[in-house]
Regions:
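Active-site recognition of the HExxH zinc-binding catalytic motif
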Residues: 79, 276-288, 292-295, 299-300
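Post-HExxH zinc-binding segment in Zn-dependent metallohydrolases
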Residues: 289-333
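Transmembrane alpha-helices and immediately adjacent membrane-cytoplasm interface residues
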Residues: 87, 94-100, 132-166
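Membrane-interface segments at or immediately adjacent to transmembrane helices
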Residues: 157-229
Length: 399
């Protein structure tokens, strides 16, 4: 009985301390309530869009474009990625606040140890308990998580459940033969060979971009939108990350950061990848989140561009994806096509392989597994392999 009374007494003291500290931290309850509301709303909209695709389609066509033309337009005023800066800032604040919490808890424990002659009530009335400090800190973290989850949902998550681009434009994929795939690969090889001499190259024979790639990507997407109405709308300029190594170590060529509605790409990678990647990320700003469709849209956008470097980027990127598919389907057929690629394109492929190989390791493998899980959680059953499904769309569209 005495033990139970002691436990109840301790719980009462902790509750009293939290109440006392709660008067000092007046916004504790408000933070918890706001965080819970935001998390519940996020879950509600994600479930609703998954159960009712027509809601997701309506949202993508009528609500999401408002965010792109307002917040996306605002963030586009800055030459750097606002989301990148925001993420670095939040990480810095998180680490600093955690260190401050730990230091404060240690100081309180030491202070109470030195003032052992005072009564418990006297000590608790002077300073909050470590539990109260931790609760206050966690409430702030929870609020930030709630805000980010809600922003992710309204600026990205719902779009995962909209109708696909192929459905919107009546492109029907089918089970094609190896011969059909081989014909596409031959066509792409011929296109690469005919354009390889039209791009600028450095002393090592590696492609260089002609002009700022961001403007070229916007122009390419706007040109393609004249043919496909689902792509019409405002496009902010895509941006290279200030620290592109963050993406390199994750084996990522680009990323759509929904918190500020920005398309970002890896500025360190081989130049031929950049136009294709910039258009890929911009396609997400039209609400098409499926990776294979973003790849296909980027492919079409590069082909529709007036710039030689964009055309070359599109054809060579499409060539890589389709040739990889042919390699898996029929090695002999792959060999027949592979030897017809001009030697002038080889430096680009070699530089690309060398670049990604230099970052291959535990970090990139872990990041790829995380990305795979993320894509599967958002309805892309094949995970990171879904990027390769653009081949199905290319064959269906051009055969």
């Amino acid at each position: 009985m005495k033990i139970n009374e002691k436990i109840q007494e301790d719980e009462k003291k902790q509750s009293d301390v939290l109440k006392k500290y709660g008067r000092k931290d007046r916004h504790f309850r408000q933070r918890i309530i706001c965080a819970v509301i935001l998390l519940v709303l996020s879950a509600f909209f994600m479930i609703l869009s998954a159960l009712i695709p027509d809601f997701a389609e309506w949202y993508s066509e009528h609500v999401y474009p408002v965010w792109v033309s307002t917040l996306g337009r605002f963030s586009g005023l800055f030459p750097f990625s606002l989301s990148e800066i925001l993420i670095y800032f939040l990480l810095l604040v998180f680490v600093a606040s955690l260190i401050r919490l730990i230091v404060s808890v240690i100081r309180i424990c030491r202070k109470r140890g030195r003032s052992g002659e005072r009564t418990g009530e006297e000590r608790e009335s002077e300073t909050p308990s470590p539990a109260a400090l931790a609760a206050s800190w966690l409430s702030r973290v929870l609020l930030v998580v709630g805000i980010l989850a809600f922003l992710y949902t309204v600026f990205c998550g719902i779009n995962y459940h909209r109708h696909s681009f192929s459905e919107e434009e009546g492109i029907v994929t089918y089970q094609y033969s190896v011969e059909e795939l081989k014909k596409i690969c031959i066509w792409l090889t011929e296109e690469v060979n005919s354009r390889v001499g039209n791009v600028l190259r450095d002393e090592n024979g590696i492609m260089k971009l002609e002009a700022p790639e961001a403007d070229g990507a916007v122009e390419a997407m706007e040109t393609l939108a004249k043919e496909f109405s689902a792509l019409q709308g405002y496009y902010p300029r895509p941006k290279s990350l200030l620290i592109s190594e963050v993406l390199s170590y994750q084996n990522l060529s680009g990323i759509y950061l929904p918190f500020t509605v920005e398309a970002n790409y890896n500025g360190d990678m081989t130049a031929y990848n950049i136009p294709f990647t910039a258009c890929h990320e911009l396609s997400h700003l039209r609400g098409f989140m499926q990776e294979e469709e973003a790849n296909f849209i980027a492919f079409l956008a590069c082909l529709s561009s007036d710039r030689s470097d964009f055309q070359y980027s599109g054809y060579l990127s499409g060539w890589v994806y389709c040739m990889n598919a042919l390699y898996r389907a029929d090695y002999n057929a792959w060999q027949e096509v592979r030897v017809t690629l001009t030697e002038e394109a080889e430096p680009d492929l070699a530089a690309n392989n060398a670049f990604w190989d230099s970052y291959r390791g535990t970090i990139s493998e872990t990041a790829e597994r995380i990305n795979d899980t993320y894509l599967k959680a958002n309805g892309q059953a094949e995970g990171v392999q879904s990027y390769n499904r653009m081949v199905d769309l290319i064959v269906a569209y051009f055969s």
